[in-house]
Amino acid sequence: MKVAVYCSASEMIRPEYFQDAEDLGTRLAVGGHELVYGGGNIGSMGKLASAAHRSGVKITSVIPKFFHDQELTFLESDEIILTEDMQQRRKLMWEKSDCAVALPGGFGTLEEVI
């Protein structure tokens, strides 16, 4: 199953939220799932992707070009899709996944899931 995960790119969140992201990244492998996410290499996104990558999960990063240009992309992803904007990112993540999970985050995470 392709699982879309929405989570924070901020480094200013509670440490246990980083652990939750790492745990989910590892558990995706146990279930034989793939990860579709926002493509970031920082915050919960980075923790999620790093753990998933270490566990052998196939990763699809969907990230706006303006974040990629700031070197915020998790480059170890199996597939990196650059979008023009956040709206296109949300649309593609929805289309490329079978289900969605939201981890704790701020207003950016909330905006992506509504």
Regions found by a protein language model. Name each.
Residues 1-96, 113:
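A cross-family phosphate/adenosyl-ligand binding-site feature
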Residues 8-9, 104-106:
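Short glycine-/small-residue-rich Rossmann-like dinucleotide-binding loops
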Residues 83-84, 105-107:
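N-terminal glycine-rich "phosphate-gripper" loop used for MgATP/nucleotide binding
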Residues 100:
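Hydrophobic acceptor-binding patch used for acceptor engagement in glycosyltransferases
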